[in-house]
Amino acid sequence: MHSARLDSFLSQLRWELLCARDTGSPPMSGPLQPKPRTDQNVQPKRQFRASDVLEEDSVCCVEEEEEEGLVAEDKGLPLGCPREHALDWDSGFSEVSGSTWREEEPSVPQRQAPRERPPHSQRFSVSDIPMRSRAAVTNIPPAHRPRPKSTPDACLEHWQGLEAEDWTAALLNRGRSRQPLVLGDNCFADLVHNWMELPEATSEGSDGDVPRARARPPQFLLGLSEQLRRRLARARRTAMASKRLSCPPRSEPDLPADISRFAALMNCRSRQPIIYNDVSYL
C-alpha cells in the first residue's frame, strides 16, 4: 500500500511539472531544467505538435494515477467490508418486495473521502480544446442508480392489476406472451371449473329409479355379439373342412383278418398306414 501511495505521489508531481512547463511559467532552477535552444529553423507548427504530445503524456499519467488509486483503495479495504457498487445488483429484494435492500443491509463504515481534484476539462486546457470528462459517471452516488428488478417482482407487478375472476380472460388474450402466469395453489381445479362446465353429480335416489339395463354401457352388448360371431364362424369352419380336402376321408368296409386282406391292402394305393394285428401266418 505504501508503494502505491508513493507511485501516485510521484505521478502527481510529474503532472504538476508538465503542467507548469506547458502553461509557460518561468523556468525552474535546478539540474532537471533543460537549456532553452534557440533555433531559427523550428516552426511554430512543430511547437504546437510538441505541446500536443506533452498534453497526451500528461493525460496518460493522470489516467495511470487514477487506476493506481483505485487499486490501492481495493487493497486497503478489509475483507469483511464489501464495496458499495457490489450491492447495486439484484440481491433478492426490490421495491415491490416487503422492505428495501438499503434498510436491511449492515452499516458500512465510511472511509475518509480523498481530497477533491479539479475537473478533467480544467486540468488540461493548454491548447484550448475541451477534454472529455469521466466524472459525470463516477460522481453518481450508488443510492440513486437505477437498480434492476427481479423476475418474480416484475411478473407480480404485471399480473397484480387483474381481478380475481378475470384472470382466465387475460390468460386467453395473452396466451402467446412469454411472461409467466401467477396462479394460486388450486389453479388446476379453477381451470377445470371455468373452462369445462362439468355437470353436477346426481343424487343416490335418482340412481335407484333408473333401471339397471339402461345403466349398462353398450360395450357389453358389443362384447356379446363378438363372442357369438366367433362361435358361429368356428362351427362353419368345421363343416367346410371336408370339402376343402383333395381326398376326402371315407369309411372302409371291414375285411376278414387273413392273408387275403393283407394282400389287398398291399396292392391298393391308399396313403393310410397298414395296421395288421394277426401275425399267425408268418
Swiss-Prot record:
It holds the Pfam family FAM212. One of its GO terms (molecular function) is protein serine/threonine kinase inhibitor activity. Disruption phenotype: No visible phenotype in most cases: most mice are viable and fertile. A low percentage of mice show exencephaly. Expressed in tissues of the developing head during neurulation. It is found in: Nucleus; Cytoplasm. InterPro entries: FAM212, Inka. Keywords: Cytoplasm, Nucleus. The keyword Nucleus applies. GO terms for cellular component: cytoplasm; nucleus. GO terms for biological process: neural tube development. Expression of Inka1 is not regulated by AP-2-alpha/Tfap2a, as it is the case for orthologous protein in zebrafish and Xenopus. Contains 2 Inka boxes (also named iBox or inca box). The Inka boxes bind and inhibit PAK4 by binding a substrate-like manner. Interacts with PAK4. Inhibitor of the serine/threonine-protein kinase PAK4. Acts by binding PAK4 in a substrate-like manner, inhibiting the protein kinase activity. Belongs to the INKA family. This is PAK4-inhibitor INKA1. It comes from Mus musculus (Mouse). The lineage of its organism: Eukaryota, Metazoa, Chordata, Craniata, Vertebrata.
